[in-house]
Amino acid sequence: MPLFKHEGTYFNYEIQGEGIPFLFLHGLGDNLKFAYETFDKDEKIQLISLDQRGHGKSGNDSRKLSYDRLAKDALALMDYLGIHHFFVGGLSMGAGVAVNLAVQAADKVLGLITLRSSATDEPMKKEVIAWFSTVSKYLPKKDGALLLEQDPIFPSIKETYPKAIDTFKRYFEDDAAVTHYKKFSDIPKDRPIKNKSELTNLTIPTLILANNYDVIHPIEYSLFYKRNIENASYYELTPKTIDAEKHKLE
């Protein structure tokens, strides 16, 4: 896969198709494969994605990760590719990065898609931040997955949102998650925008996708963007916990 360099860091990216440019950004702990597993090939769309800083095959530095930095990385990729106008979207953390990018570069973004937003002008819920911080603490340790199961917070995760357990355990098998473990502490404490007033300048077509029964991506976060982005359309998906295949098709 091709690489580009920004601020001394190499980023892995991929392009599929030759149509309208659509940059899609993955969630926390994931990688660019998500975009190509989610969207079918379409000759009318040029699907672009990158392993965001500290994810997949992309590098990172010692500085704190933030939505601002991730959005600047994504913008740097589009500048590198010579693409000056494009659609942008993302899942979870990627949705927040997409919103931040659209606010930073409203003159470049033709449209916005957010899928299961994980933060607004407020960070994740304190309970969820504690979950991710605990995972971050054990990722660099030997037998970290076992230590997580022995932590006092583990039963509350299992009781509140058992689906998160499988996600967290996968992190311990991912080299990028283990190497760049601090991202699981940094990002949940950050927020894509500082105030909802930043959204008033977004007049581009916006599609907001959400589903219920998701503690990490509460539906009220997506409704926040629906209320505060002028041209936003909203669609509620079937929750993955009810029908994962239908969720993916939608």
Q: What is each stretch, according to the model?
A:
Residues 96-104, 109-139:
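Flexible "cap/lid" loop of the alpha/beta hydrolase fold
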